[in-house]
Amino acid sequence: MHQYQIHWVEHSEVKILSNIVVRLEYKERGVKSITNRRARHDAVSESKSIDYSGKKHIALVAGGMSAEREVSLVSSKGVSKALIALGYKVTFIDMGADIAFKLQEIKPDIVFNCLHGTYGEDGCLSGLLNIMRIPYTHSGVLSSALAFDKIYSRSWFLTNNINMAESIVVNKSDNIKIEPMKRPYVIKPITQGSSIGIEVIFEEDDFNFANYDFPYGDQVIIEKYIKGRELQVAVLNGKALGVLEIKLLKNRFYDYETKYTEGFAEHLCPAPIPTNLYDKLLIESEKIYKTMNCKGPARVEFLLEDQTNKLYALEINTHPGMTPLSIVPEIAAYAGINFTNLIEEIIKAASFES
C-alpha cells in the first residue's frame, strides 16, 4: 500500500488544500480503493510553480464544496501528472467563493475543470469563465446545467425520442404517505453524481417512503427499476470511442461504493454485445452529445433490459471521472488513447462561449 498526502499550493501565499489524504492501493490496472483519512497539514505540493517555457499555463480547478469533492481531488491528481508530462505550467485551485479573484490573480491561459457536482458540473464555473473570457475544458453553461438536472435532462431526452424508464417527480412538500410507485423502484436526487443518494427499493426491503428525509434537496425522481446490463459509452470531442459493460460483483446496483472500490465490479471493454447493438449505442451517444451541444469528454449511460432486450438511456455525464477506476479513461485506452493523450485532447477543445 502506498499513501499519498496531497497538499497543493495555488500561489506563494495561498494554501489551497492541506487536509486530504487519499489511500491508493495499486494493482497493475490502477487504484484499488479511495478512502478519506484524518486531516494532515504536512504534505508538500507536487505541482507548485512547475513552469515550462513556451507552454500554456493551466489552472486545474478541483475539490469544491459538493458531495463529490473527494472524487474530484483524486481525478485532479492524475490530470495534474498528465499536464505536467505534457509540459504545461500547472496551478491547482481548490474551488471556493473566491475563485474569480484567484483566476484574476494567476491569469491562466486555460482552466481545466476537474470539478464534479455543484458549481463545477452544473454550468456555474462555465458561466464565470465565459464572463472572464478564459477558455475552459468540458461543456458550456447550458449543456452542463441541462445534463446535471435529472428532471430537465429527462425532458430533453424524451423530446428527442430517446427511450427512458417510467418515472415521476416527488416533492418534499407533497408529504406522500404511501408508496409513490409499485416496487421495485429507484430514488434519485435531482442534482447529484457518482450515484450519491441513489436508493433502490426492492419488494423485500423494510422501507417506508413516508419517513424518507430528502437528504439531497426537496425533490427526487422516482424511477421504475429495470433489471438489466449496465452499458457505458465514452464520447470525446463528438466521437464515440467505445462501449463498456459493468458487471456487478457484490452490490445490487452501481452505487458509489461499487464505482470507486476495486473488486466490486468488473469492466468488460469492449462490451460483449452484438455488433448491431454496439454500433447503435455509439450512434445514439453521438446524437445525444451533439444535440446537447456538449464539448470535450462525456459519458452516456444505458441499461439493456434482461427480459425484453429493450434499451433505456439513463443520463449523460458531461464531467466524467478521471480516477484510475473511471470509465472514460478505460474506454479511451481501448480506443488507443492513453491517459496523457486523453488529457491533451481535452485541452485542445478548450474554449469559452461568447
UniProtKB/Swiss-Prot annotation:
Mg(2+) 2 binds at E315, N317. Its EC number is 6.3.2.4. Keywords: ATP-binding, Cell shape, Cell wall biogenesis/degradation, Cytoplasm, Ligase, Magnesium, Manganese, Metal-binding, Nucleotide-binding, Peptidoglycan synthesis. It catalyses: 2 D-alanine + ATP = D-alanyl-D-alanine + ADP + phosphate + H(+). GO terms for biological process: cell wall organization; peptidoglycan biosynthetic process; regulation of cell shape. It holds the Pfam family Dala_Dala_lig_N. Its cofactor is Mg(2+); Mn(2+). The keyword Lyase does not apply. InterPro entries: ATP-grasp, ATP_grasp_subdomain_1, D-Ala_lig_Van_CS, D_ala_D_ala, Dala_Dala_lig_C, Dala_Dala_lig_N, PreATP-grasp_dom_sf, RPE2. Pathway: Cell wall biogenesis; peptidoglycan biosynthesis. Residues 154-348 form the ATP-grasp domain. The keyword Endoplasmic reticulum does not apply. Belongs to the D-alanine--D-alanine ligase family. HAMAP family: Dala_Dala_lig. NCBIfam families: D_ala_D_alaTIGR (TIGR01205), PRK01372.1 (NF002378), RPE2 (TIGR03774). This is D-alanine--D-alanine ligase. It comes from Rickettsia canadensis (strain McKiel).
